[in-house]
Amino acid sequence: MSQVFSNLFQMTQRLEAQGQKTLDSPFVWDDGSDHDDVTKIHVRGDSRGINCIRFDYIKSGQRKYKSFYGPSWAGFTQTFKINHKEDEQLESVEGFYKPDSRTIVGLQFKTNLRISELIGHGKKDDTKFSLAVDGKKIIGFHGCSGSYLESLGAYFTCIAPTRMEAKGAKGGTDWNDGADHEGVAKIYVRGGRDCIQYIKFDYVKDRKYIYGPAHGVRGRGFTESFEINHLDNEYMVSVEGYYDEGDSGIIQGIQFRTNIKTSELIGYNNGKKFSLAANGKKIIGFHGYADQNLNSLGAYFTTSPFIKLESRESTGDLWDDGTFEGVRKVCIHKQPVLYSVIQFEYVNRGEVENRDLGLRVFIAEEGEFVVNYPYEFIISVEGTFTNEKDPHVASLTFKTSKGRTSSTFGTPGTKKFVLQSKGCGVVGFHGVLSNDYISGLGAYFRLLPPLPDGEKVEAKGGDGGASWDDGGFDCIRKIYIGHGEMGIAFVKFLYDKDNKFVVGDDHGSKTLLGVDEFELEHPDEYLISVEGSYDVVDGSESEVILMLRFKTNMRTSQVFGLDTTSSFILEKECHKIVGFHGKIGKMLHQIGVHVLPIID
């Protein structure tokens, strides 16, 4: 394998063309480096190689169209679009060329967000090459094209990190730890009576700790820390918190999430909720405002790397689907002994894309495994190989981020393999075909993204009282209902998040009439709907909730409050309730829910 890789960080860097060295050829071409980004790549080829290529660029917001290099013969045509408006940038190119003719036969393009499928082919005797510079993006190409593409090189420039603006108030001193780090190593938080007093971050760069300053002022309260093990490929991926919606705007509570674990909420869940997260990226620095307390917090993000794993027992022709946002379905077809076809259903920018491989004769469908993307990812693939001279994949089993395991497809062999990367999910598959059978299987992994927020179902009831919102969790564990003379006076909910109890706030006031409870049988039972009624009562200018009744996948609760006819139902088909919101005064005026899709 020929590899060109550099860690130099000059503004523009030229990597020499890989393939046939023909500098004196009349077919040498050079697009130069006077571009901001690559926006589209056109590739034409046939079974003998890539015969024609063209690159479109962006400069100062305008597209620049270059010429096709090479003849336009019959064969396949493929394009790869790069969406610079979504901060997508071309980072590297891998390819294959014939060692005798030096003709380039296959190309694969990698951006900071995804990897293209292999365009063309890569056989076991072909030479592999790579054009990549750590921390840089491609802004131009050069090469040589005769009857086929004979060589390809690239120009690189530095990638700027993504800055997410600070959430909270902008009073006090503007502080900035910068983005010149590889990751966050440790976080120290000092909490006071009503807010976060100060915060401090330690970072890592070149395997060395960088100790950051404290932002804010130390006072009476509690100190907590959260450590990230970068040696175990652990990265900070998001921050959630709350800030005061009043004049102060200061941070009330904060919670950190890595690709492996989530911290406890440090502080209080009071005020307006905020989130610092970017899909497929990790946090490498923080900034914000601080005075006597932490007033606001923002972050710098950079792309997290794809992790490419593979297991093979024999040689053959390479296949590579590239990467997508997630996997939705895997379908298995087989002949009596060996796998003949595997079909993958991926999601890319909201669209479903299908890929399949293998021999399409005498096949029968064995089964399928459906993944509830974007709330669920495949996190590991376990398999075995056949006991033969030229082994092939004999069985496959898939596990997901929600703890589900598929049935075992196929008949297990004796030699096992596992594709898994801690804290990451599968976003694409690749492998090896030998005599039209799958002799090797690999997967692309990427950091598990923050789960999408649950859908908020509008509250029902009157307009009186003050708003409250517990937010969304994984499920409901227990419900407390306090009675008043004319309806519901108090509610409180016990939630579950990452298999840990989360106690919700008290909403309303308990009365002498007492508090009833409704407990769910976790983890098998979950809440699917809430029925209730509301009306104006004596002493209240707006409607109050008179009655509530809860329905799960297993049973229906007793009536809480007055035994009246139901006037509303809070539910969404194929969803479960994972949180509550509403309005409360002396009585409960409104109640609404947060829901998430039910995973079978």
Curated annotation (Swiss-Prot):
Keyword Repeat: yes
Any one Gene Ontology molecular-function term assigned to this protein's record: carbohydrate binding
Keyword set, alphabetical order: Lectin, Repeat
Name under which the protein is recorded: Jacalin-related lectin 18
CDD domains (alphabetical): Jacalin (cd09612)
Jacalin-type lectin domain ranges (all copies): 12-158, 161-303, 304-447, 454-597
PROSITE patterns: JACALIN_LECTIN
Natural source organism: Arabidopsis thaliana
Family stated for the protein in its record: Belongs to the jacalin lectin family.
Classification via InterPro entries: Jacalin-like_lectin_dom, Jacalin-like_lectin_dom_plant, Jacalin-like_lectin_dom_sf
